Regions:
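N-terminal secretory signal peptides that target proteins for export/translocation
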Residues: 1-18
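Bacterial N-terminal signal peptides
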Residues: 21-32
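Sec/Tat signal peptide C-region and signal peptidase I cleavage site
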Residues: 33-37
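Residues immediately within or flanking Cys/His clusters that coordinate Zn2+
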Residues: 48
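Short cysteine-rich clusters marking metal-coordination/redox-active sites
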Residues: 51
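Cys/His-coordinated zinc-binding microdomains
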Residues: 55
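Mid-length scaffold segments of soluble, non-membrane domains
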Residues: 73-116
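Thiol/selenol-based redox catalytic cores and closely related redox-interacting motifs
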Residues: 99-162
C-alpha cells in the first residue's frame, strides 16, 4: 500500500512540474509578444505620403525621413525632424483626435548611417550649416560623440536630446 502511495505522489509531482513548465512558457510568450508590440518597426513611406506640416512628398527625401507611429497602427511621415517636432507639439492642429499618449513610436533618420532610429535615443545638433528640405534642421545622431564631431565640423550651436526640444527651440530654427 505504501508503494502505491509513493507512485501516486511521483505521478502527481510530475504532472505539477509539467503544468508549471507549460504555464511558464505561456507567460514567456505573452511577455515577449507584449514587449515587441510596444516598439513597432518603422515603415518606408510610399510615393503618396505627404508631410502633414508642409505638404511635401516625403519619399523624395529619404535621407531626412521622420515618422510617428500611433498605437492604432497609423503613421505620419515627415521630411525632417523639425516638421516632426512641429507636429508632435501641436497634434490638435495637425491630427485632432490624437494626443501624445496615442503615440507608439517616433523615428528620425540618423545623419551618417541614413537609417531610422528611435528619436528618444538620438542626439540632435541644432544650428549647423547643413540644411534639410525645409531649411535649418535638427540633425540626429546615434551618439553624443558623433553629434559633437558634426557640431564642430559644421558650425553647430547646440546638442540636444529629445526631452530638451521644445516649441521654442523649433521656432528658433525658422527665425
Amino acid at each position: 500500500m505504501e508503494t502505491g502511495q509513493r507512485r501516486n505522489r511521483r505521478l502527481c509531482h510530475k504532472r505539477m512540474r509539467g503544468t508549471f513548465w507549460v504555464a511558464g512558457v505561456v507567460i514567456w510568450f505573452f511577455w515577449v509578444g507584449s514587449a515587441l508590440a510596444l516598439d513597432p518597426a518603422p515603415v518606408k513611406p510610399s510615393k503618396k505620403d505627404k508631410c502633414p506640416v508642409c505638404g511635401m512628398f516625403v519619399y523624395k527625401y529619404p535621407d531626412w525621413v521622420g515618422e510617428i507611429i500611433f498605437k492604432d497602427g497609423t503613421t505620419a511621415f515627415f521630411d525632417g525632424a523639425k516638421d516632426l517636432f512641429k507636429y508632435y507639439f501641436d497634434l490638435k492642429k495637425y491630427n485632432h483626435g490624437k494626443t501624445q499618449k496615442d503615440i507608439a513610436a517616433i523615428y528620425v533618420t540618423e545623419y551618417y548611417d541614413v537609417k531610422l532610429m528611435d528619436a528618444h535615443k538620438a542626439f540632435f545638433v541644432m544650428g549647423s550649416d547643413v540644411y534639410g528640405p525645409m531649411g535649418r534642421e535638427l540633425i540626429p545622431f546615434y551618439t553624443k560623440q558623433d553629434a559633437g564631431e558634426f557640431k564642430k565640423d559644421h558650425k553647430g550651436k547646440r546638442i540636444l536630446v529629445f526631452k530638451q526640444i521644445t516649441p521654442a527651440v523649433i521656432k528658433k530654427l525658422d527665425d
